[in-house]
Regions:
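Hydrophobic ligand-binding cavity/cleft-lining segments
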Residues: 1-45
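Glycine-rich portal/gate segments that line the openings of hydrophobic small-molecule binding cavities
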Residues: 13, 32-36, 40-86, 111-114
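Generic serine detector
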Residues: 8, 27, 32, 41, ...
Length: 127
């Protein structure tokens, strides 16, 4: 894999309960909405579960993702192709945290910041 090893960990406040955050992170329909303009391809429309494989793409960059672990307050994804590494989400009432580590040519910190901002916007009342 070409690129540099990068590590980023961000935590933000969100106007939502833990259940609402989880729902946005494990529903393929919700993920596709708030991660736009990324294109997501899921095997079905069921909630993510351990072992679920899916693909995301942004322009020519494709990232294969596999759900490594999931519970009521944590989601861990193994990443390959455009990013070789992992992303871990954890959350609680009023906050969400994302840790992203991997080798990539992409600026992962910028990607992660934009992703968290989009999630924060999607969790605002009325969204």
């Amino acid at each position: 894999m070409l690129g540099n090893f990068q590590r980023s960990e961000l935590r933000i406040e969100v106007p939502a309960a833990a259940k609402a955050i989880r729902d946005r992170l494990v529903s393929p329909t919700d993920l596709s909405k708030w991660l736009f303009p990324q294109q997501l391809s899921f095997p079905n429309n069921e909630a993510l579960a351990t072992g679920t494989k899916f693909q995301s793409s942004l322009g020519p960059v494709i990232v294969e993702q596999v759900v490594d672990y999931i519970d009521d307050c944590c989601l861990r994804l193994r990443l390959s192709q455009g990013i070789d590494g992992y992303q871990e989400w954890s959350w609680g009432d009023g906050w969400v945290q994302s840790r992203l580590e991997g080798i990539s040519l992409l600026p992962l910190n910028l990607y992660q910041t934009a992703t968290l901002f989009r999630l924060q916007q999607a969790l605002k009342p009325g969204e």
